[in-house]
């Protein structure tokens, strides 16, 4: 249930994204130099498809830098993208001028993508001068992230509410569930004890109270049996 803030939401193995990562490294393309001749990078195309609109992207090595860059351009229209989050529909996520997303690539914890509405930027391209601390990704990592986003687009068409609510009889005693995301009902002062209790039950939840746990896709309902039979009191 700890899925690295959504980076491992498609699984910890990485699948075809890690295969491409390995293949590019094997070809010796290990630097951050330009390895493809195209007006728009494949990663930018993938992000635009995911968000259903043309986007200009920048990468950052911290959540803080990405958020500050978004706010410097669009202080009232910067938001966070989480797949399968009902909040996306409420705020019409595809109309947000600046969106921050974490690519669904496990073990890449220090990469954050800021996706800016292309039309809004073209209206005033000088806005980009306000961006600070953007980084250039090594090509192999960029390829892997591109594949992970396409894998997410595919998964968005396959995973539905029915894949998560089957665990509600156990989980909703301790969390409020929004899609696959679990926000703790357990008071913050009791959260560390609760996390340790879950470990005793063979379950790894988010160690950070402010970072939601995530319902594991396709998990056997039996994995929560120990928690069901040994409830945590708070």
Can you describe what each PLM-predicted range is?
Residues 1-27, 193-195, 199-200:
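N-terminal "arm"/small-domain region of PLP-dependent enzymes with the aminotransferase-like
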Residues 1-2, 56-60, 82, 99-102, ...:
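General beta-strand structural signal in soluble alpha/beta enzymes
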Residues 16-66:
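Conserved N-terminal alpha-helix of the aminotransferase class I/II PLP-enzyme fold
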Residues 35, 49, 53, 197-234:
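PLP-dependent enzyme catalytic core of the Aspartate aminotransferase-like
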Residues 45, 49, 53-55, 59-68, ...:
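Glycine-rich phosphate-binding/catalytic subdomain of phosphoryl-transfer
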Residues 68-150:
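Active-site PLP attachment segment
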Residues 129-171, 187-189:
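Structural signature of PLP-dependent enzymes
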Residues 163-197, 213-219:
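Conserved PLP-binding catalytic core of the aspartate aminotransferase-like
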